Amino acid sequence: MKSKFLLGSLIIISGILIESTSFSQSSGSNIWPNFRGVNCSGIASPKQNPPVNFSPEQNVIWKIALPEGHSSPCIWGDNIFITGFDGEGKLLKMFCIDRKKGAIRWEKKITVDNFEKVNPVSNPSTATPATDGERVYFYFSSYGLLCYDYKGELKWELPVPMPKSNHGMGTSPVVTGDLVILNCFGHQNDPRLLAINKHDGSIVWKYSLPKKDNYSGDSYSTPVIYKNQVIVYASEGVSGYDLKTGDRLWNFAIGVTDAICTPVLGKETMYTTTYSTRGNLDMRAQFPDFTEIIKKYDVNKDLKVDKTEVKDYQILVNPEMSDDSQKRTLAQVFGMWDSNKDNLIDSLEWNNMNLSFASFYEKQGIKAIRLGGQGDLSLNSILWGNPELVSHVSSPLYYNNHVYMIRDGGIISCFDSESGKLLFREKLGTTGAFFASPVAANGRIYIAARNGIVIVVGAGESLKIIAKNNMGDIISATPAIVDNKLYLRTAKTLYAFGEL
């Protein structure tokens, strides 16, 4: 359902496909204007040649300590914009850093009394800033949207109600034409897509999802631009919205739990991954019959179970990951089964949720979807798909007519972008989670694991590992590539790497 607000001025939008934003990959080698670069593609501008080998001691142009945060570098010219989080001081921080010197040009702080509740491996500073070359736009889920000029002067701010989600918001703003687009579909309390006038912070239009009796999943995805549309991946599916009016033009229903990745665009085609908890054949949950649950956990013999009775029944969300924070007991996710909210699970609720899990398994996978249609695209617009070893948090990469995805546990898959043929599926030689998304330059792909290992592979039809670089610190942020440099954020430091 779309709500219209006053249009302050005529919005002119032009361009096509990946070049559809107000700038393109040919705009120059010195921009990486939002999460994952131009239109979230993950691809550096032509002729970029970042280093292959690097570490905290090798090929370091500069490094600078930063507070905790998962946002990625946003770059325009000699300016890097990035955010941080100070939990003790209850501060959210915004930085402008001199790209050549690694010195802070300005720092802004806002005090927040109550931070959004997030996953233990996350924090309230996850959104990557976006810029148009004149102003920079910061989003914090615990505060809202703020706009600064390059001198650090606040131009406007837009409070956004704190979202309610399972893990904390993961989306980032994008700028196109005169609009800042913000995906708030992850809000369980008011899911909506916002288009904001970048000049004054007024809301131009918003599209609200219809309210449902039952929670259907969060959206952590960042919007991408296709021609005169904005594409957003939400729990209901991937949809295209008219940039001028906010009307929903089409929808591709998916129906998995959460919308996590950011789609990427190819030749009139969109590629997205739809992850389902333990959806791979060898990881699917084999839930016992409810009679076994009753026999083992029903202490008061009422043929139902409550949270206290199942506090030790463990469900592995990601069994291929070694991180204990990714493990859950039934008590922790009790609400997923307790559909009538009476704080009890009975046999009907148990069986219904298990059937729901089974349907999620069937819908997961990487998918290639033909663009250009209207209405419901679910039946005739899928070009190909593959259900196995799907990436969880990291987004796919479309590069040189191939599509790559990185699975937690260190598994890379490569597909022909047109036919969907699996060209290879191999182990990268490092395990654990992959929160950062792959980026590409000069025929190479840079893949950062959360354990601090950055793997450089050659793009092509077979796996060729060129280098493995150990940063010795956690990596959750996606790297940026500008001016033959690799800008990489770890848990404590922002690095600029170049050939020395």
What annotation goes with each model-predicted range?
Residues 23-500:
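Noncatalytic, solvent-exposed loop/strand surfaces
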